Amino acid sequence: LTGEAQAYYEREFAFFKKVTGISGSLRPYVKCSKPEKKAKIDEEMAKIAVEEGVYLPSNPDGAVVDIDRTSGRPLQSAAKTPFMATFKVRRAVAERTNPDDPPHVDVWQSAIFKVGDDCRQDMLALQVIAQFKNIFMAIGLDVYLDPYRVTATAPGCGVIDVVPNATSRDEMGRAKINDLSDFYKNRYGDEHSVAFQQARLNFIQSMAAYSVVCHILQIRDRHNGNIMFDGEGHVVHIDFGFLFDIGPGGMRFEPYSFKLSHEMVDVMGGHESPGFAMFEQLVVKAYLACRPFAHEIVATCGLMLGTDLPSFKGKATLDRLHERFKPNMTEREAALHAQWLVKDAYGNMRGTLYDLIQEKQNHIPYRR
């Protein structure tokens, strides 16, 4: 690169190096209170100048024109120091019906910045989640997945899109909302209202898809800080640092099936409700839908086999991944297996104990 191209490259990399570097500057504060971390983030954000043409690595389709310098927020992590910040992003308008309309639109976009985490694993998980989404869409199966963007910007550094208008179960607990059903009623109205029923449907459809994905990929660390609920009532799983053959602390303590707590089932209407029956039916359909694509999904994961990602334990990892599709089962046997997964997951004691451990160690609340 030479001339203006070289200058543009240097401006862009200098910009997100400074922003991402704030996460690194927080390391001495890892054991400090959130207000102390927040003050440090604000101090560092005030130093950052926005130069012309720079963009967020996870959103190259728009230019950053400003920063909300008081938006920095430290995020929950036992050993790392991720933080979230908000930027004003200017995007070109593709089609203007009126020539007097402005050629661009400004939107506020939040992103999470990490140092000390290998985001390649998140990128892999989300790439595979996008594969699952395409499979389900191709057959017209009404389930929901949100493969948001993650970009590894350097070894051990990355930028992660924030799910818009979403709240984690952890944040609900800290706001003294101790029941997931209460959250849905407070946000969408009475249980018999149209808005609540639509949110419940969105919840069920997304729970079914993520349940299958979490089982197939053996996604771990499913505490309440890693489960989000968007503005339409969908569940969205985030943070894929533990999958396949690893779990937090080197153990695989959580359920083999997936997380399905009592309060999640309560949002569906209860264990004996039509909502739960729909959930179980969608889990079976989603599981059967992805089985013919087992080789493609395994092949995508196999691209990372030669890396040093901790989730891979050699070819055996891929063999176990392929086995979870139950390739030797008939369609009926596979459907019964999916039903067994739902039965195993419901109120699984391992999931409850993991939530208890997270509450004791990291102060992440859950409903008892």
Predicted feature residues:
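Canonical protein kinase catalytic loop motif
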Residues: 218, 223-224
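ATP-dependent kinase catalytic cores of phosphoinositide-metabolizing enzymes
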Residues: 1-209, 224, 229-368
